């Protein structure tokens, strides 16, 4: 044991000497310099400056060190882009050199890092196949048109649940209700089943499923010592790998069981094919065009379930928080709904184009509460030059979307909820306007934007069109706090619970 400790200390000392020499050499020049950044402490670099909310800490540092700054996180060099111009540089202009995804140590489990579309490089054949399938078979306009009835039914059930709460005078946990809606949508689209029930968050499958998804998104977003100091990775000092082994493993097992049941059913002579994504992929896996394995399908589905359930639900909850904080905006939205949607109980996807204030409201929610405030970090595949600065190979690259959307030089009154700012603007969240890129941009942008957009507009619109909302007595200030919890998805710290009142 003593020999191991001495060897580790010797290695750490040698690494520190080399790191300081290498860092000094880069800053002196030699073909270019690093972007400016805050002073670094020995060994830990700037880790102490991240805090519990890295997106906010990095935004504060960017005010001093500029829209492209460098930091040292343990022995990892990192660069943070905090302006639309720098975001365009790292995501588009240098997108090839800087597009390798960062794979956290904690998710190198169950083979997930080897086949997850979120972790694979854009040069990977698996990545290309799965992105093509997602784009053509799941998120294209024809594919979404074919699954519109599934989404309409989920919205109807959400409305029915809110109406039940209204009849009983019972508060509805908005985040849980929207999570149930989105997770049931994912499972209905993928497997033709519903996994969870409204109002049953403390029982059975509901509690376990949401616990798994929340644990995955939270723990994947936590800064991990094992990523900053790979020498400590086998020790898993924060226990993140252990936690994710359990939670990710449970979701993989759930999906594998559903796939196995379908494979067994398809062997039956009287099997009637289902019009879901699983049957589509199983058919494709038997052909030569896509060369899909069951393992790839399983991990792809887990990626879809996590991303589709949690981020959209969190964004819808934030939307309701802002509207309840600003009753004048809510009334303006309700008036538009009454004029366009009329007596219908559900906002249809075909209505969205005729609801400019609803579209502006969703844009403003994405601006104030981007689901992934730092996007998914990338790694430099090769050395790249951004303006006069050099980004060395293997540098971790972040885009601080949260800093961009709170920048007073871009947005007037950036901390205020003002949907009106988008009524006379062509800016949207689909990846072309770098002032607002909650889903990223370029080759690694989220392919699920069309689905997320449809559901967010319809969920927020339907809840506002059918109900007035009251907060529980004595809980008003707590319920409407804007405090968030950092992770892959930016969650509200105190869940919003409000009583729907049928209009």
UniProtKB/Swiss-Prot annotation:
Membrane-spanning segments: 2-22
Pfam families listed in its UniProt record: p450
Tissues in which the protein is found: Highly expressed in roots.
UniProt keyword terms in alphabetical order: Heme, Iron, Membrane, Metal-binding, Monooxygenase, Oxidoreductase, Transmembrane, Transmembrane helix
UniProt-listed CDD domains: CYP76-like (cd11073)
Role, per record: Monooxygenase that oxidizes 11-hydroxysugiol to produce 11,20-dihydroxysugiol. Can oxidize 11-hydroxyferruginol to produce 11,20-dihydroxyferruginol. These products are intermediates in tanshinone biosynthesis.
Name of the featured protein: 11-hydroxysugiol 20-monooxygenase
Organism: Salvia miltiorrhiza
Lineage of origin: Eukaryota, Viridiplantae, Streptophyta, Embryophyta, Tracheophyta
């Amino acid at each position: 044991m003593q020999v191991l400790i001495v060897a580790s200390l010797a290695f750490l000392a040698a690494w520190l000497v080399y790191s300081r020499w290498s860092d000094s050499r880069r800053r002196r020049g030699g073909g270019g310099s690093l972007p400016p950044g805050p002073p670094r402490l020995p060994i830990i670099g700037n880790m102490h400056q991240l805090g519990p909310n890295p997106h906010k800490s990095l935004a504060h540092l960017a005010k001093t060190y500029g829209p492209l700054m460098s930091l040292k996180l343990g022995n990892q060099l990192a660069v943070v882009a905090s302006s639309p111009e720098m975001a365009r540089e790292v995501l588009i202009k240098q997108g090839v050199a800087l597009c390798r995804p960062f794979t956290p140590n904690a998710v190198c489990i169950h083979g997930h890092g080897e086949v997850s579309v979120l972790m694979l490089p854009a040069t990977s054949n698996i990545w290309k196949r799965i992105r093509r399938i997602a784009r053509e078979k799941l998120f294209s306009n024809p594919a979404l048109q074919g699954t519109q009835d599934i989404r309409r039914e989920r919205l109807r059930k959400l409305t029915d649940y809110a109406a039940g709460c209204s009849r009983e005078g019972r508060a509805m946990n908005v985040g849980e209700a929207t999570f149930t809606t989105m997770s049931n949508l994912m499972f209905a689209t993928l497997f033709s089943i519903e996994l969870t029930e409204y109002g049953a968050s403390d029982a059975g499958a509901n509690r376990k499923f949401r616990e798994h998804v929340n644990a995955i998104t939270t723990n994947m977003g936590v800064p991990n010592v094992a990523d900053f100091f790979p020498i400590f990775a086998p020790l898993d000092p924060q226990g993140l790998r252990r936690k994710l082994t359990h939670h990710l493993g449970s979701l993989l097992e759930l999906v594998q069981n559903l796939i196995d049941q379908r494979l067994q059913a398809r062997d039956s002579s009287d099997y009637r094919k289902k019009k879901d994504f699983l049957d589509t992929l199983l058919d494709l896996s038997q052909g030569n065009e896509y060369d899909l394995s069951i393992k790839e399908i399983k991990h792809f589905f887990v990626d879809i379930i996590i991303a589709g359930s949690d981020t959209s639900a969190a964004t819808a909850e934030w939307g309701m928080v802002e509207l309840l904080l600003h009753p004048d905006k809510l009334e303006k939205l309700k008036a538009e709904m009454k004029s366009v949607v009329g007596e219908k109980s559900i906002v249809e996807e075909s209505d969205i184009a005729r609801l400019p204030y609803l579209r502006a409201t969703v844009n403003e929610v994405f601006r104030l509460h981007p689901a992934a405030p730092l996007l998914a970090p990338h790694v430099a595949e090769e050395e790249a030059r951004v303006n006069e600065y050099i980004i060395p190979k293997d540098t971790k690259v972040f885009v601080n979307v949260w800093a961009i959307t709170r920048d007073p030089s871009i947005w007037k009154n950036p901390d205020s909820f003002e949907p009106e700012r988008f009524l006379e603007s062509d800016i949207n969240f689909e990846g072309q306007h770098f002032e607002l890129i909650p889903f990223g941009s370029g080759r690694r942008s989220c392919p699920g934007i069309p689905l997320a957009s449809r559901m967010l507009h319809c969920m927020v619109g339907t809840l506002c069109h059918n109900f007035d909302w009251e907060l529980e007595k004595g809980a008003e200030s707590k319920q409407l706090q804007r405090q968030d919890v950092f992770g892959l998805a930016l969650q509200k710290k105190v869940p919003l619970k409000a009583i729907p009142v049928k209009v």
